[in-house]
Amino acid sequence: MVKRIKNMSELKELFSDAGNKLVVVEFSAKWCGPCKTIAPVFQAMSLKYQNVTFAQVDVDSSKELAEHCDITMLPTFQMFKYTQKVTPFSRLKRVLCCLRSGPKSKMIFECHGADAKQLEKKIQELM
């Protein structure tokens, strides 16, 4: 199941509840074509990988959170895990951390676009 996140408080609570589990957050918008394409795949992944926490942020209704997380492309997927930080990889070759002053979860991966194979491969790798 994909949990809808509306603000930073809900995101912090999600990380707290996730404990040591991998957290995958999708930043998307209703008007975004690639977001619509990947949405059912993301939902299916949430059912397939029950030991991973999945969340979705609508950037139009959660502008402050999207800005805080430096979202510039849609869809963007950010993966977080408790305090240990793994070497990050990004198609844009940059590391963006959504939680500069939040809970102890760290972003360990970010990807952009509706590439379901890459997303699933990275989830399997980081679980």
Curated annotation (Swiss-Prot):
BP GO annotations: cell differentiation; spermatogenesis
A GO CC term assigned to this protein in UniProt: acrosomal vesicle
Record localization: Cytoplasm; Golgi apparatus
Principal subcellular localization: cytoplasm
PROSITE patterns: THIOREDOXIN_1, THIOREDOXIN_2
Keyword Cytoplasm recorded: yes
Keywords for this protein: Cytoplasm, Developmental protein, Differentiation, Disulfide bond, Golgi apparatus, Redox-active center, Spermatogenesis
SS bond list: 32-35
CDD domains: TRX_family (cd02947)
UniProt tissue specificity: Testis-specific. Only expressed during spermiogenesis, prominently in the Golgi apparatus of pachytene spermatocytes and round and elongated spermatids, with a transient localization in the developing acrosome of round spermatids (at protein level).
SUPFAM superfamilies: Thioredoxin-like (SSF52833)
Domain Thioredoxin: residue ranges: 2-127
Entry similarity comment: Belongs to the thioredoxin family.
Protein role: May be required for post-translational modifications of proteins required for acrosomal biogenesis. May act by reducing disulfide bonds within the sperm.
Protein's recorded name: Thioredoxin domain-containing protein 8
Organism expressing this protein natively: Mus musculus (Mouse)
